[in-house]
């Protein structure tokens, strides 16, 4: 796993991607993550976990748009949430830190699959598990509306 230098700022560590998303997880098996990383190379994927990451996730660091935050702290979480444009609810197991509620409070859209959806409000966009390309299109359509 890449180790960030303590002398680098948060912006230096995440690079100059035009768009940012986050995934809070407690597993190394994030649903369709590799497909999404490939299909959305201009989106930085910030993946946060309260523990260390397993091999299935660490091996995806070959993609420059994947940034892993093992054993994250509240300050790191806040900095990531200040940077993201949307949230991907694609963690297939238990929700971490009631993150969908936090994302709704921030007024950001959430994209998820039927098998990973943790939101009970009906405010997010839910796709069938085999509709990865449709999710990519919806994300593209959304980020095209963001003014920079």
Predicted regions and their residues:
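Conserved catalytic-core segment of nucleotide-activated headgroup transferases in glycan assembly
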Residues: 3-62, 71-74
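Conserved active-site histidine-acidic residue motif and adjacent donor-binding/catalytic loop
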Residues: 50-51, 66-80, 94-96
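Structured loop/turn residues at beta-strand edges in well-structured enzyme cores
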Residues: 61-64, 82
């Amino acid at each position: 796993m890449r180790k960030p230098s303590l002398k680098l700022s948060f912006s230096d560590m995440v690079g100059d991607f035009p768009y940012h998303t986050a995934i809070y997880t407690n597993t190394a098996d994030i649903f369709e993550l590799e497909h999404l990383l490939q299909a959305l190379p201009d989106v930085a994927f910030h993946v946060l976990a309260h523990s260390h990451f397993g091999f299935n996730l660490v091996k995806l660091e070959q993609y420059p748009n994947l940034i892993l935050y093992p054993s994250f702290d509240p300050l790191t979480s806040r900095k990531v949430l200040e940077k993201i444009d949307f949230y991907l609810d694609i963690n297939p197991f238990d929700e971490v830190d009631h993150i969908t509620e936090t994302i709704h409070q921030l007024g950001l859209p959430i994209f998820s699959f039927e098998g990973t959806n943790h939101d009970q409000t009906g405010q997010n966009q839910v796709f069938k598990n085999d509709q990865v390309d449709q999710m990519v299109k919806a994300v593209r359509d959304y980020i095209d509306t963001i003014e920079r």
